[in-house]
């Protein structure tokens, strides 16, 4: 049973994937917010921008009720229209955004998969990085994880916060291993979408 993850030195971000839920998605988001992660990244890659914007409004409202930061994914123009100044983007999108557009955000997170990408994202103004995938995960079946050595190398090469992603669980031993590598936190996808019992 999980009560809270917000009292950890190691920061936990929830990343959504509504296809993993066993109950209505918004109900699951509320359950996630009840354990107070550092933030919720609304990552629903199959939606159109219009569909995403409609869902984002509802998720932002739930996050606001629980005072949990909501980070919108990919559709940065929609984020601005909704008054959300925290976004998580693929590196190719960050490369196309102007400096003036970047200034409209208080937080820009970037997904990276190599040390070179990490350095590039930092140079372009990323506030934090997610580096992965670190552990084996069903989301990346057949792909070998990059592992803790990769995470440690990324953390050594940049001066911005790094979160591990990929196969991250509610496992303090795992969290400790990532923290020793220099990561500030980890992103949990499957575990967050399947929380069913709270203390």
Place the predicted regions along the sequence by residue.
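Glycine/Thr-rich beta-alpha phosphate-binding loop at enzyme active sites
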Residues: 82, 86, 109-156, 195-197
